[in-house]
C-alpha cells in the first residue's frame, strides 16, 4: 500500500516538473490516472503491463509533449485517431479543459476503457467513437495521434478532416508523436516540421521522441 502511494507521488512530480501551473482539479485528475488505468488494465489490457508503473513518464508526459508544441485554444476541435487507451487524448483533455477532444478507435474494448477513465475523472470535454476514422464526418483544427501508422498512411486516413478556418499559431493539420529517424518516412512531406522532445524533457525515455507537425489544406 505504501509503495503504491509513493509511486504515485513520484509519478505526479514528473508532471509538475514540466507543467507547474496546474489547477487543483487538474492535479486531482492527473493523480487519479494511475489507479484508474491499473484497475482497468487488469480487465482489459490497453497499456503494456511493464509500462503501467511508468504510466506518467511513458504515456502521460509523452502525450503532453504535444502541449509543448501547441497550446490549444478554447473551443478548438481536436481528434485523437487510434487513441488506444486514451493517449494522447485524455492527458491533453485534462490540460486543455476548454478544448473539445474526439477520441476514436476501431477496437471496442479500448473505447470502453477510455469511456470508464473519462467518467472516473469527470472530464466533460471528451467524446468517443468506436469506429474507423474514415467514417468520421466532422472536421477539426488538429488531428493528434501516437504512431499508429506510417505518415503516408495516416495522412491518407485524415486528409479531408481539417477545418478551413485557422485559429492557432501553427496551421491546422496533424500533430503526430513519433520516434526514431523519420528521414525516409517524411521524404514526401516537405512541409512537415519536427520538434525534438529532448528539447523539452530531459529524461532518457525521450531521447529519440518527436512531435511532427504537418499542415494540411482544407478540402471541402
What spans do the regions from the language model cover?
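Active-site capping/gating segments
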Residues: 181-220
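Conserved beta-strand signature within the Rossmann-like core of class I S-adenosyl-L-methionine
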Residues: 167-181
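Short glycine-rich anion-binding loops that position phosphate/pyrophosphate groups of nucleotides
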Residues: 147-150, 182
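Conserved hydrophobic residues forming the short capping helix/wall of the S-adenosyl-L-methionine
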Residues: 41, 117-118, 162
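Conserved SAM/SAH cofactor-binding pocket of Class I
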Residues: 64-145, 155
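A short glycine-rich, Lys/Arg-flanked "PGG" loop and its adjoining helix->strand segment in the class I
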Residues: 155-171
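N-terminal auxiliary segments of SAM/dcSAM-dependent transferases
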Residues: 1-45
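Conserved SAM-binding loop and adjacent beta-strand
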Residues: 29, 47-67
Amino acid at each position: 500500500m505504501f509503495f503504491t502511494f509513493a509511486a504515485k507521488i513520484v509519478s505526479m512530480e514528473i508532471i509538475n516538473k514540466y507543467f507547474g501551473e496546474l489547477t487543483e482539479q487538474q492535479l486531482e485528475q492527473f493523480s487519479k490516472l494511475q489507479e484508474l488505468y491499473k484497475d482497468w488494465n487488469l480487465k482489459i489490457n490497453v497499456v503494456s503491463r511493464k509500462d503501467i508503473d511508468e504510466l506518467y513518464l511513458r504515456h502521460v508526459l509523452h502525450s503532453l509533449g504535444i502541449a509543448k508544441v501547441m497550446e490549444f485554444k478554447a473551443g478548438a476541435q481536436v481528434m485523437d485517431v487510434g487513441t488506444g487507451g486514451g493517449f494522447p487524448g485524455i492527458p491533453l483533455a485534462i490540460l486543455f479543459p476548454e478544448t473539445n477532444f474526439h477520441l476514436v478507435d476501431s477496437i471496442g474494448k479500448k473505447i470502453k476503457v477510455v469511456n470508464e477513465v473519462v467518467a472516473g475523472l469527470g472530464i466533460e470535454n471528451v467524446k468517443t467513437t468506436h469506429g474507423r476514422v474514415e467514417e468520421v464526418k466532422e472536421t477539426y483544427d488538429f488531428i493528434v495521434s501516437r504512431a499508429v501508422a506510417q505518415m503516408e498512411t495516416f495522412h491518407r486516413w485524415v486528409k479531408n478532416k481539417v477545418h478551413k478556418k485557422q485559429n492557432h499559431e501553427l496551421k491546422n493539420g496533424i500533430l503526430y508523436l513519433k520516434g526514431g529517424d523519420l528521414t525516409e518516412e517524411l521524404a514526401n512531406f516537405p512541409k512537415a516540421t519536427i520538434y525534438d522532445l529532448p528539447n523539452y524533457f530531459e529524461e532518457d525515455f525521450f531521447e529519440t521522441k518527436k512531435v511532427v507537425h504537418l499542415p494540411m489544406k482544407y478540402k471541402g
